[in-house]
Amino acid sequence: MSEPFKSGFVAIVGRPNVGKSTLLNHIIGQKIAIMSDKAQTTRNKVQGVYTTDESQIIFIDTPGIHKPKHKLGDFMVKIALNTFQEVDLIYFVIDASTGFGRGDEFIIEKLKNVQTPVFLLINKIDLISPEDLFKLIEQYRELLDFEEIIPISALQGNNVPNLLEQTNANLEIGPMYYPKDQITDHPERFIISELIREQVLQLTREEVPHSVAVVIEGIEKNPKTEKLTINATIIVERSTQKGIIIGKQGQMLKQIGMRARKEIESLLGSKVFLEIWVKVQKNWRDKEHYLHDYGFDREEY
């Protein structure tokens, strides 16, 4: 007789840049969470769905927890903390190469107040010696009663199968919430805007901070050629940032568009014509109506 089907919700938390999105994308096998080495790149709860014959795990990738500096930051932290209460299991991801930091202390204090079981995932183990890894495990073991402590490399996939096995063991019998072939519940528009934003952050590096939002104005399909036309607007806070994104003779914007288009085509499996505009909206991160317009919906959280 076959085992009963199991399912559950798992939150992935940790301070910025520890590899949460990399882990989620490795498990799902497709890029659904924006990846960049800048802090705070994941803004909304991106759900990834991992389904096998035995179980379904719904992953919630939360923003990196940090001390908020403005309304957007405050909003991001609130999402992460609310998520702790809603899930069946929490992955607390840390970066082995940077060791214990104040950000980790802040998260552990929050985790002490929840009943949800917590897995400590020590990521980037390929960057430290076994001796240092052992010391790190001992250090964290004294801070919280973790359900499991699992060293991994999210980038290379080391020990991820073991992590999924342990996760399954902690799930309850439950329904299949999503169709087997569905990997995220985020609408395509959201993922397309995130793919464009990822290229902006990667190509402009430190020059353009997180005062960037991307709004998809329209998606049209040509019935004859099946080609998609996507109109997008990049929103920044200052005209200097607009200049950086457009670049000399429009070269930077061209690069952003070219790279984003390839990612979008690979996601949607069809040819895309991508048109991008850049618009200045001063201090949008501190104005609630702008946050709502750019996809940050307070009602949802």
UniProtKB/Swiss-Prot annotation:
Gene3D superfamilies listed in its UniProt record: 3.30.300.20, P-loop containing nucleotide triphosphate hydrolases (3.40.50.300)
Region (G5): 152-154
Subunit relationships: Monomer.
The keyword Cytoplasm is assigned to this record: yes
Database matches in CDD domains: Era (cd04163), KH-II_Era (cd22534)
Protein name as it appears in the record: GTPase Era
Family: Belongs to the TRAFAC class TrmE-Era-EngA-EngB-Septin-like GTPase superfamily. Era GTPase family.
Region (G2): 40-44
Residues where GTP binds: 14-21, 61-65, 123-126
UniProt organism field: Listeria welshimeri serovar 6b (strain ATCC 35897 / DSM 20650 / CCUG 15529 / CIP 8149 / NCTC 11857 / SLCC 5334 / V8)
